[in-house]
Swiss-Prot record:
Source organism: Saccharomyces cerevisiae (strain ATCC 204508 / S288c) (Baker's yeast)
CDD domains: AdoMet_MTases (cd02440)
Protein name, per record: Alpha N-terminal protein methyltransferase 1
Gene Ontology cellular-component annotations: cytoplasm; cytosol
Lineage: Eukaryota, Fungi, Dikarya, Ascomycota, Saccharomycotina
Alphabetized SUPFAM superfamilies for the sequence: S-adenosyl-L-methionine-dependent methyltransferases
Length: 232
């Protein structure tokens, strides 16, 4: 019997791997940083995706557009994209060298009052404050959670959403219906079908999905998923 890919995940191995990676854009993007199309195309794709969703993401009850950047690395997504959409951003990241660099990268946004809390913790140990977030953004990080832990994490995120809040998951997909385990960083790349199954198990409704365009062909396909809690 085949062993599920996610059963091989070890948090300690992942932390060890990322702690040894350079705290740079090139480091956090696995060598596809400056000098490649990946950072620019990634930001363009995310910006366009959120703009298309704008009318479905209106804050309610005088809430501010408070976002949280999950698996934030050195703060690249917040610095280049999220701050254009959100009034304030919290960040969640367990790797100490990345957090140290994050303070440098986000200094200007912090001076403008756009940076809130920085949580030095892994997703599996993070619980959001109830009703706090307009947007929970998870990019290139949920592969470090086994399936059951990811379902539990998403359920906690639902509690952390404002009324009409949204969760976005932006992740690699396998081009097949099977999941791939990468022992290098102890992570799993999931199929599109597996993600949809996990979202349903967590009680989330998929309101939009789009494939990221313009990335090098040798990379996995990347897909964005916009999610809202299923009606009770």
């Amino acid at each position: 019997m085949d062993v599920p890919a996610d059963s091989h995940i070890k948090y300690e191995d992942a932390i060890d791997y990322w702690t040894d990676v350079d705290a740079t854009v090139d480091g956090v993007l696995g060598g596809y940083g400056e000098g490649t199309v990946v950072p620019t195309m990634d930001v363009l794709g995310s910006n366009n995706f959120l703009r298309k969703l704008k009318s479905r993401m209106l804050p309610q009850e005088n809430n501010v557009k408070y976002a949280v950047d999950i698996g934030a690395g050195i703060g690249r997504v917040s610095k280049t994209m999220l701050h254009k959409h959100a009034a304030k951003i919290d960040l969640v990241e367990p790797v100490k060298p990345f957090i140290e660099q994050m303070h440098v990268e986000l200094a200007e946004l912090k001076d403008k009052g756009q940076i809130g809390q920085i949580y030095e913790v892994g997703m599996q140990d993070w619980t959001p404050d109830a009703g706090k977030y307009w947007l929970i953004w998870c990019q290139w990080c949920v592969g470090h959670l086994p399936d059951a832990e990811l379902v539990a994490f998403l359920k906690r995120c639902i509690v952390g959403l404002q009324p009409n809040g949204t969760i976005v998951v932006k992740e690699n997909n396998t081009p097949t219906d099977t999941d791939d385990f990468d022992e290098t960083d102890s992570s799993v790349t999931r199929s599109d079908a597996k993600f949809r199954q996990i979202f349903e198990e967590a009680g989330l409704k998929l309101i939009a999905s789009e494939r990221q365009r313009g990335l090098p062909r040798e990379l996995y396909p990347v897909r964005m998923y916009a999610l809202k809690p299923m009606p009770n």
